[in-house]
Amino acid sequence: MATLFIADLHLQTEEPAIVAGFLRFLAVEARQADALYILGDLFEAWIGDDDPNPLHREMAVAIKSLVDSGVPCFFIHGNRDFLIGKRFARESGMTLLPQEKVLDLYGRNVLIMHGDTLCTDDAGYQAFRAKVHNPWVQRPFLTLPLFIRRRIAARMRAGSKAANSSKSLDIMDVNAQTVVAEMEKHRVQWLIHGHTHRPAVHELSANGQPAFRVVLGAWHHEGSMVKVTPDNVELIAFPL
């Protein structure tokens, strides 16, 4: 019995080794799981479910194969792929979840999320996030021709990279008070998230008790997953 969590794969055709590693993960490790949760940024960018990128179809087929084998797959949007919609969810068999979800995992209540909402010290990013998550912004964007959406997305990624290069690492990490507030709001002692690309298990105090924040790593030269069993919560790095 095990439930698996991954995040921040940033899949793109320019990184075939990561794509191949994910396909192998779906065919091997994930097939033995009770469920797979993808906590955002599965893709490097997403400009709409109507994008004919062959990689998207390939990933949908692979995830659907996992689901059809009896392993449910759940997805929380990240900051790169927040426009993944019902069409891709239907094609891949994934179940879309809200940005925060509490799970009962073998007797543990675990809060899961992408993690970008915890980085409250980065006021500029939070303002940008609020804007692009506004349905009144998303709907007009999704009606634009694909070539225009690609240009806008490329410009936004370049702008984000430039902005991040001038920010301190502390600003781009989670805010400790925000973490505790979220865990106490949901009355949990466990939190699993991604986004920061800083894999670690942090011990803290919440609800007057010891608590744990488990941060998934990004997939680069190796993969990263959290494996939850009735007896343990493990952060695991593995070769792609």
Swiss-Prot record:
<protein>
    <recommendedName>
        <fullName>UDP-2,3-diacylglucosamine hydrolase</fullName>
        <ecNumber>3.6.1.54</ecNumber>
    </recommendedName>
</protein>
<keyword id="KW-0443">Lipid metabolism</keyword>
<dbReference type="InterPro" id="IPR004843">
    <property type="entry name" value="Calcineurin-like_PHP_ApaH"/>
</dbReference>
<feature type="binding site">
    <location>
        <position position="167"/>
    </location>
    <ligand>
        <name>substrate</name>
    </ligand>
</feature>
<keyword id="KW-0441">Lipid A biosynthesis</keyword>
<comment type="function">
    <text>Hydrolyzes the pyrophosphate bond of UDP-2,3-diacylglucosamine to yield 2,3-diacylglucosamine 1-phosphate (lipid X) and UMP by catalyzing the attack of water at the alpha-P atom. Involved in the biosynthesis of lipid A, a phosphorylated glycolipid that anchors the lipopolysaccharide to the outer membrane of the cell.</text>
</comment>
<dbReference type="GO" id="GO:0009245">
    <property type="term" value="P:lipid A biosynthetic process"/>
</dbReference>
<feature type="binding site">
    <location>
        <position position="122"/>
    </location>
    <ligand>
        <name>substrate</name>
    </ligand>
</feature>
<comment type="pathway">
    <text>Glycolipid biosynthesis; lipid IV(A) biosynthesis; lipid IV(A) from (3R)-3-hydroxytetradecanoyl-[acyl-carrier-protein] and UDP-N-acetyl-alpha-D-glucosamine: step 4/6.</text>
</comment>
<keyword id="KW-1003">Cell membrane</keyword>
<feature type="binding site">
    <location>
        <position position="41"/>
    </location>
    <ligand>
        <name>Mn(2+) 2</name>
    </ligand>
</feature>
<keyword id="KW-0479">Metal-binding</keyword>
<dbReference type="InterPro" id="IPR029052">
    <property type="entry name" value="Metallo-depent_PP-like"/>
</dbReference>
<keyword id="KW-0472">Membrane</keyword>
<dbReference type="InterPro" id="IPR043461">
    <property type="entry name" value="LpxH-like"/>
</dbReference>
<feature type="binding site">
    <location>
        <position position="197"/>
    </location>
    <ligand>
        <name>Mn(2+) 1</name>
    </ligand>
</feature>
<dbReference type="GO" id="GO:0005737">
    <property type="term" value="C:cytoplasm"/>
</dbReference>
<feature type="binding site">
    <location>
        <position position="164"/>
    </location>
    <ligand>
        <name>substrate</name>
    </ligand>
</feature>
<feature type="binding site">
    <location>
        <position position="195"/>
    </location>
    <ligand>
        <name>Mn(2+) 2</name>
    </ligand>
</feature>
<dbReference type="GO" id="GO:0030145">
    <property type="term" value="F:manganese ion binding"/>
</dbReference>
<keyword id="KW-0378">Hydrolase</keyword>
<keyword id="KW-0444">Lipid biosynthesis</keyword>
<dbReference type="GO" id="GO:0019897">
    <property type="term" value="C:extrinsic component of plasma membrane"/>
</dbReference>
<dbReference type="Pfam" id="PF00149">
    <property type="entry name" value="Metallophos"/>
</dbReference>
<feature type="binding site">
    <location>
        <position position="195"/>
    </location>
    <ligand>
        <name>substrate</name>
    </ligand>
</feature>
<keyword id="KW-0997">Cell inner membrane</keyword>
<feature type="binding site">
    <location>
        <begin position="79"/>
        <end position="80"/>
    </location>
    <ligand>
        <name>substrate</name>
    </ligand>
</feature>
<comment type="similarity">
    <text>Belongs to the LpxH family.</text>
</comment>
<dbReference type="GO" id="GO:0008758">
    <property type="term" value="F:UDP-2,3-diacylglucosamine hydrolase activity"/>
</dbReference>
<feature type="binding site">
    <location>
        <position position="114"/>
    </location>
    <ligand>
        <name>Mn(2+) 2</name>
    </ligand>
</feature>
<dbReference type="InterPro" id="IPR010138">
    <property type="entry name" value="UDP-diacylglucosamine_Hdrlase"/>
</dbReference>
<feature type="binding site">
    <location>
        <position position="79"/>
    </location>
    <ligand>
        <name>Mn(2+) 2</name>
    </ligand>
</feature>
<keyword id="KW-0464">Manganese</keyword>
<feature type="binding site">
    <location>
        <position position="10"/>
    </location>
    <ligand>
        <name>Mn(2+) 1</name>
    </ligand>
</feature>
<feature type="binding site">
    <location>
        <position position="41"/>
    </location>
    <ligand>
        <name>Mn(2+) 1</name>
    </ligand>
</feature>
<feature type="binding site">
    <location>
        <position position="8"/>
    </location>
    <ligand>
        <name>Mn(2+) 1</name>
    </ligand>
</feature>
<feature type="binding site">
    <location>
        <position position="160"/>
    </location>
    <ligand>
        <name>substrate</name>
    </ligand>
</feature>
